[in-house]
């Protein structure tokens, strides 16, 4: 990897940060792991970018292009509706991607799709489709996500979705290295760059078509 995003589960997701804390303290605690990762990344030459994963009763969204300062000054994001979330994040120049949109698991009461309320969709999720994955492993989730993104003309992303030190190798290969979370948001939303997606096992073009080895 040239770089990674730290996208931990936020306030209504699976987080270890005490939800009873005042907003400012909660944000500092939530962002602390990112700074730890970034400090180590700086030592070894790995770019580390901030993001987070919001949760609406099992429906999850990956948020990019915002930072700790933005969270501190926008406490309304915590209880924002999905519609309000898109507006707030876009005003910052950020990006809202529907995470693993067609995954079916016990923690997801029902699959809810809202193509008009996102900037794109995660078409490739290594936790769903890599042979190394130890959870949620069903490649059909990715196949359906790709079909969904194509149907609604949504740009696609890819990621590992790891919750441990397991190295799945999922992600996106860009022609030029990213310089910030905002840069990532602009490249995905702009759809001008011919990037490729991977789950660590297979490669796909940005439209979700398999690239032969």
Give the residues covered by each predicted segment.
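Conserved beta-strand termini and adjacent loop/short-helix elements that scaffold enzyme active sites
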Residues: 51-53, 99, 159
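A metal-dependent hydrolase metal-coordination microenvironment
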Residues: 1-91, 116, 123-152, 163-169, ...
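Active-site core of metal-dependent hydrolases
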Residues: 97-100, 120-125, 178
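C-terminal functional module detector
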Residues: 6, 89, 93, 152-154, ...
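Active-site-proximal loop/helix segments of hydrolase catalytic cores
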Residues: 78-81, 92, 97-116, 184
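General structural signal for secondary-structure boundaries
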Residues: 26, 65-67, 76-82, 107, ...
